[in-house]
Regions:
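Conserved catalytic alpha/beta core of Sir2/sirtuin-type deacylases, generalized to analogous enzyme cores
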Residues: 1-288
């Protein structure tokens, strides 16, 4: 009895907040989307359970992994096994299509607005869904790029064809030695272009995107701007969440909206200009 009542109230509250968000979107001069892992989770990119077992059951059996993240951090003894794991990881989370059209639904809501996207996600789903690449800033890298593990230079390299070959030719949890990627400049092993430590490569494209984002914020500071926080958590809060809170507080005509199942909240300083929806992102986007 109690659970039904709470669920009904929760649904009604979510619908009311979705209506407020629809109105805020319609009235905004600009929309700044900040996206985190929760957005891709809503789109079906889950890293454990059935999806993990489908693609990594052999690694799970050998090493006892229960999710993709665990396997990604494991210190494999040989590069051939390391790349057998990572080529699958990259393929299913970067080159395969998302199971649900959440990114496409988001694009439909903002495509006619003056928008910009900043994201800590590295799965390239915004571009795959049709977002303008000149309105995207991937701060933490891209599964689709290799870099030198040293690194000896600030260069990145597209990896789709190499990853495809490693997927097709691996046997017994190992890729052929000749497919192990090495830096074309210094010959050292390559790694993914992911921000894990101070070896992360910020190439020319990264810096151009950072400047476009900064310029977008400068141009819209005095306008009605909606900061739309989708699925960001507290792993790297300074990149999206904290900066959105600060700008929503400092800009008189700005508003903040957050959709995130289990983590939808805003500080008291901006409570009056915030819309927080504790629900699945994809479900809410369909209500707007």
């Amino acid at each position: 009895m109690f659970s039904r009542t709470l669920t009904r109230k929760s649904i009604q509250s979510s619908l009311r907040q979705a209506e407020k968000l629809r109105s805020a979107l319609q009235g905004a001069d600009a929309v700044v989307v900040g996206a985190g892992a929760g957005l891709s989770t809503s789109a079906g990119f889950v890293y454990n359970g059935e999806r993990f077992q489908q693609y990594f059951c052999d690694f799970a059996s050998k090493y006892g992994f229960s999710d993709m993240y665990s396997g990604g951090f494991y210190p494999y003894e040989i590069l051939e096994e390391y790349w057998a794991y990572w080529s699958r990881y990259i393929w299913v989370n970067r080159y395969m299509n998302a199971p649900k059209p959440v990114y496409e639904d988001l694009l439909a809501l903002v495509k006619d607005k003056d928008y910009f996207v900043i994201t800590t996600n590295v799965d390239h789903q915004f571009q795959k869904a049709g977002f303008d690449k000149h309105r995207l800033f991937y701060t933490q890298g891209d599964y689709g790029l290799f870099q030198c593990s040293q690194p000896c230079c600030q260069k990145t390299y597209d990896n789709e064809e190499t990853v495809r070959q490693m997927m097709e030719q691996q046997r017994n949890m190992r890729v052929p030695s000749e497919l192990v990627p090495r830096c074309p400049v210094c010959g050292r092993p390559m790694t993914m272009n992911l921000r894990c430590d101070d070896t992360f490569v910020e190439n020319e494209g990264w810096h151009r995107a950072a400047e476009r984002y900064s310029e977008f914020l400068r141009r819209h500071k005095g306008l009605k701007t909606l900061f739309l926080d989708l699925g960001t958590g507290m792993n790297t809060p300074t990149i999206v969440k904290f900066s959105f809170w600060r700008m929503a507080n400092e800009w008189p005509d700005a508003a903040y909206a957050c959709i995130n199942l289990g983590e939808a909240y805003a500080p008291k300083e901006i409570e009056a200009k915030s819309i927080c929806i504790n629900a699945d992102i994809g479900s809410v986007l369909k209500q707007i």
